[in-house]
Amino acid sequence: PYSIEHPDEDCEINLAGLINVLENCRKYKVKTVLFASSAAVYGNNENVPLHEDLALMPMSFYGITKMTSEHYLRVYHELYGINTVVFRFANVYGERQGEGGEGGVVSIFCKLLAAGKAVTVYGNGEQTRDFVYAGDVAAAIKAGLAAMGYQTINVSTEHETSVNQLLGAFAEVAADKLEVRYAETRQGDIFRSALSNARLKEILAVTPQMQLKEGIQKTYHDYVKRGK
């Protein structure tokens, strides 16, 4: 993962950047902050689906800075009364997603397949993730604007999908281009991940709607259409 190779940059962006934002929120009396956290804060926890009250044990510097950011947000809320929603996003995917960062596996696969290049899978492909469509994430963010107090909410489908299953979804839209190579597991990678979305449904009344196969189809076709 990028943060393992660039811990200084990860800290500068995720922590120093957040503090700059929060200080200006305090200064200009901003009433509400919505924060993009990550499933990475949970670490390699086998209690799937993971709920928001579990102990956090991140395995990457990215997860550490996201966890620390949540504490900064909580204290700013307690000191200055800023309404805050911490969204712990599962693996978000969708049209126009970049190929960088910690969670862009779908867009990376799109880029490689569209270019006729082999896809590299780190590990045996049985590691799982919770893939949530960007449109469903947008619905959660919109609903979060009205939230009061301090809330921590997973944004997820609550469904485990292995990387091999993800490749199966890609095979349905780009079977003639799909070539897979397996490599050693990367340091800091999590083996299983799926997040409970009970709180998302209860507090924000949002239920993710997009099915993975349809979402992959939309994302890949958009990628090819735009000639990326």
Question: Positions of the model-derived regions?
Answer:
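N-terminal Rossmann-like NAD(P)+-binding domain of SDR-like oxidoreductases, especially those catalyzing
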Residues: 1-92, 206, 222
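Short glycine-/acidic-enriched loop or helix-start segments at secondary-structure transitions
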Residues: 2-3, 44-46, 96, 131, ...
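Residues at the N-terminus of a long alpha-helix
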Residues: 57, 99, 130-133
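Conserved donor sugar-nucleotide recognition element shared by glycan-biosynthetic enzymes
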Residues: 61, 69, 102, 163, ...
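Hydrophobic alpha-helix immediately C-terminal to the catalytic Tyr-X-X-X-Lys motif of short-chain
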Residues: 68, 72, 76, 109, ...
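C-terminal substrate-binding subdomain of Rossmann-fold SDR/epimerase-dehydratase oxidoreductases
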Residues: 113-228
